[in-house]
Amino acid sequence: MSEMNRIDHYLSTDGIRITVADVTDAARRAQEIHHLPSLSAVILGKVLNAAAILAMDFKNHEGVSLKWVTNSPLGTIHADAYEGRYVRGFIENPDDGTIPYTPAEEAKWVSQRGKLFVTRYSLLKMPYVSAVDLADGDTASCVSDYINSSDQTLSHVEIEALTDKEGKIIRMAGFIAQLMPEGDKKLF
């Protein structure tokens, strides 16, 4: 388990809340521990980033677990984020390294006929599980679909990865923008 680099929250006067998460160290460490090739490393890093963003959206130091059933050769991807500082995760069947990372490959491997289960843990309540069927798209668009359907909050998620020529992660960061109830939809 690795401590996240940084998470920042912003709230505009127009009623738009933004949470930015940088999980570069956690993504690098996961790539190293699990000996992941580029495609698997980027996908796991993005799922770790999604878990971090979702966990910081909750109150009372809640934790969140993602169970991402890909229906691809990757199998299931697991990620947890808790205490506002920690993330961990793994891929059931990492790819063999012959496929270089591209956004099109990411979408193919994470979303086709897949399902995302999100479990929220709270000190005050019983765990709550919700799920969404995944449409075609990358990791971030699948998380956006989950939030928009499950939380019914107008949201947009972006998660980006930067790798070197050998496929090692250089940077892994993302954000969620959400329209607050008093926010102006025209500005979102």
Name each model feature, range by range.
Residues 2-188:
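Interaction interfaces in information-processing and related assembly proteins
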